[in-house]
From Swiss-Prot:
The gene is rplF. Keywords: Ribonucleoprotein, Ribosomal protein, RNA-binding, rRNA-binding. GO terms for biological process: cytoplasmic translation. Part of the 50S ribosomal subunit. InterPro entries: Ribosomal_uL6-like, Ribosomal_uL6-like_a/b-dom_sf, Ribosomal_uL6_a/b-dom, Ribosomal_uL6_bac-type, Ribosomal_uL6_CS. The lineage of its organism: Bacteria, Pseudomonadati, Coprothermobacterota, Coprothermobacteria, Coprothermobacterales. GO terms for cellular component: cytosolic large ribosomal subunit. Belongs to the universal ribosomal protein uL6 family. This is Large ribosomal subunit protein uL6. NCBIfam families: L6_bact (TIGR03654). Pfam families: Ribosomal_L6 (PF00347).
């Protein structure tokens, strides 16, 4: 039995869950999320808890058991609290700003990088070197943050680039000049 899959998902007050076969719809104060899961996983709603069970002991179904439960938990958390990822921009002349709903960044290219706003994603720029990506769908929020980060992955020597908040990477030492002579 999956250690994650056997735990029930508690549905908080203000969140409604509708299960139609293998399709789960979660509505909350922040929005609505719908997702269709593998039919070999049985999903049921008992009082204020979502129970996830598998119908067979095949290896693939066992793997899907915990994954399905985690995805449902993320849906419930997303519509009740939401998700956000904070990115820090490090580098001389690197900065971000909002242009309407779109995010515009100067990252050392000959042109500004513009990221179009996507439905379900909000950008915030509390300071010129900080970008907050938020929304209710965890997968979408983290994917958009990863796509933004891909424009300038942190440099191993100087640390210039786009970092996740709290990310720690050791910087490599530069060339040792004059040694070994």
């Amino acid at each position: 039995m999956s250690r994650i899959g056997k735990k029930p998902v508690v549905v908080p007050k203000g969140v409604t869950v509708t299960i139609d076969g293998s399709t789960v719809t979660v509505k909350g104060p922040k929005g609505t999320l719908t997702r269709t899961f593998d039919p070999r996983i049985k999903i049921s709603l008992i009082e204020d808890q979502i129970i996830v069970e598998r119908t067979s002991e095949e290896k693939e179904v066992r793997a899907l058991h915990g994954t399905t439960r985690a995805l449902i938990q993320n849906m419930v958390t997303g519509v009740s609290e939401g998700f956000s990822v904070t990115l820090k921009i490090r580098g001389v002349g690197y900065r971000a700003e909002l242009k309407g709903k779109d995010l515009q960044m100067s990252l050392g290219f000959s042109h500004p990088v513009v990221i179009q706003s996507i439905e379900g994603i909000q950008f915030q720029v509390p300071s010129a070197d900080t970008v907050v990506v938020s929304g209710i769908d965890k997968q979408l929020v983290t994917q958009v943050a990863a796509n933004i980060r891909r424009y300038r992955i942190p440099d191993a020597y100087k640390g210039k680039g786009i970092w996740y908040e709290g990310e720690q990477r050791p910087l490599k030492p530069g060339k040792a000049v004059g040694k070994g002579k």
